Amino acid sequence: MSLLQPMRDMAAKMKTLCFKIMNFEHLDGSYTSESKLENGGHWAVRFVSSKTAKSTKRRLSVYLVCFPATDNPEWSISTSFAFRFLNSWGNSKTKISPLCTHTFTAKDNSKGASGFCAWDDIVTPNSGFLVNGVFTIEFDLSISRTTGYQIEKKDHTSFLADGKLIVEDQTIDVCLALLADNSPVLYDMIYNENPGQTEFEIFDFTYDSILGMVSILQLDEFKVNVRNYRDLLELGQRYQIVAVMDQCEEFLLRTKKVSIETKLKLSETFQLHFLQFRTIERIQCMERLEAILDENIDIEDKTYEALLEKMKQLKSQEEKESCSCKKKHCGRSRV
């Protein structure tokens, strides 16, 4: 069972923070990444590892760091989180941390795993965790309470409608700058290909899907569901709109109305790595896993490899559970 198991039911409240570290193999001492603002805190990752240690004994420590986004001395953020190391998209080589719970304050602003793994496990050539010298770590972060900080609500009147989208003979009033800021494709269409134009006709998508996209960007109330998620994924991919892709992925993580096979295909088509990781993690039946492999011959190589590794894990669990000696084998070494 994955160490992230306790976080499964918190998918609706979870935020994933991704950090990419350049030239990671040259780390010596302590390094703190650039921060990301989220829910009243500036979040960063801190690594600690010393070159003075013997190569066979050198370890890597990993900490989540949160600095206050306010001067309020009562500021604090209560969280649950776990992290994982990733290599290239879709590959199942990961290292997963235990679940941590912590309340970050101005004086106690870091929490993590000391000596989490061997240094060589990460930087050895072909280990899978350095991709062109870049090391990637993701934190699944669930915030249960924030004190001493009030998140400001955006004033939607600042999104002045200065343009129109015409879809299926219906008109949607939009802020062109808002569209352009969230989509490089729409930026080119609005400012480079058609400078000065304020009305744009969209032919490839339905009125409902375009309205959904605009609602997501304007932070209006909108729900992704089984009827619209596919159109929104295609729209988000075509226009390269991260916010739309994220909303669809969050829906797919929560819903039980979409099959495992469909989620795996979607993770390939739309490069939804987190969806693939969580979907494979939740497969706990060997027969189901074998059926997926047998019935989906068109599955991509990276997903196929990840499913094979999951099969190895399930077989290993079955062997331990079926052992007749009734002794615990985990952690034992042969003499």
Curated annotation (Swiss-Prot):
PROSITE patterns in UniProt: MATH (PS50144)
Which SUPFAM superfamilies does this UniProt record tie to the protein?
Answer: POZ domain, TRAF domain-like
Can you give the residue ranges of the BTB domain? 161-226
Q: Which InterPro entries match?
A: BTB/POZ_dom, MATH/TRAF_dom, SKP1/BTB/POZ_sf, TRAF-like
> In this record, what's one Pfam family?
MATH_2
Q: Please, which domain of life does this record's source organism belong to? A: Eukaryota
Q: Where is the MATH domain?
A: 14-141
Protein name per the record? BTB and MATH domain-containing protein 39
Name its species. Caenorhabditis briggsae
Instruction: State the gene name recorded for this protein.
Output: bath-39
